[in-house]
């Protein structure tokens, strides 16, 4: 019986995202005075001299957050920006820059990725955001 309870307690599907974050980061302690709001909120708040910087990151996973059988890549690109800037906005901050990191399989053609980036570009234009870098792997 104890083994079954231990197995159930160890199942990701049994806890919320917030509970998971608390469990896996409980031994981390901030060492920098610049960290004002850390893990556990929608975004991090850092203070450098008199300047506040808010940082957020979200990941979208196919089959979990979107389904390409009915979501056009342009819409996915737009959504990928919105889900990230919404965390910044929820902290009452105007987003200004984004990094895009993408892991894409070789099943996609270059023009498909161009369509994805059309959506990213449209969201950036609509919200006056600069794309300043990121990481791409395939």
Where are these regions (language model features)?
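Extreme N-terminal cap/leader segments of soluble proteins
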Residues: 1-72, 91, 100, 118-119, ...
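A glycine-rich phosphate/pyrophosphate-binding beta-strand-loop-alpha-helix module
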Residues: 2-3, 75-138
């Amino acid at each position: 019986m104890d083994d079954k309870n231990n197995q159930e307690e160890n199942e990701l599907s049994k806890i919320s995202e917030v509970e998971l974050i608390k469990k896996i980061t409980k031994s981390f302690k901030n060492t920098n005075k610049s960290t004002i709001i850390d893990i556990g909120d929608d975004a991090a708040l850092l203070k450098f001299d008199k300047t506040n910087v808010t940082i957020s990151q979200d990941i979208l996973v196919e089959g979990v957050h979107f389904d390409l059988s009915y979501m056009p890549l342009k819409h996915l690109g737009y959504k990928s920006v919105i889900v990230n800037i919404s965390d910044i906005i929820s902290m009452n901050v105007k987003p200004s820059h984004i990094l895009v990191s993408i892991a894409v399989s070789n099943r996609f053609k270059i023009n498909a990725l161009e369509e994805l980036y059309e959506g990213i570009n449209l969201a950036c234009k609509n919200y006056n955001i600069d794309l300043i870098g990121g990481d791409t792997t395939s």
